Amino acid sequence: MAKYFTSSHSKYLLKVHIIFCVKYRKPLLVRFGSQMKSIPLGVAASSDFSIEVMEVDKNHVHMLISYPPTLSVCSIVRRLKQLSTAELWRMYPNYLAKEFWKERTFWSDGYFACSTGDASSETIKKYIEQQG
């Protein structure tokens, strides 16, 4: 049975499967694999959402995120992308300047988001775990 969260005026269970890609689909996540798990987990720890499961492929990241109704999916993605880009540029400025021609970017502009709907969290978790 699903565990619902309760706040002062709502009861909810909101989960979304999010995927975002490296700009130009560059296979850079192989190089940054360990940071690509720790950075988003750190962002989530200081935010109102949580990352239940995450897998990193060579050029994209899959996440299953649980969040309250006060947040939008867009704001979650924006926060994850902005803070991870800033942290990666802080750690690897010379390498990233060569890869992106000094444009301070890392992620492509778009993202994929899908509410989990009728699929169980376990089904989504298994799918994401098989992606890396």
Where are these regions (language model features)?
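Basic nucleic-acid-binding interfaces
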Residues: M1-G132
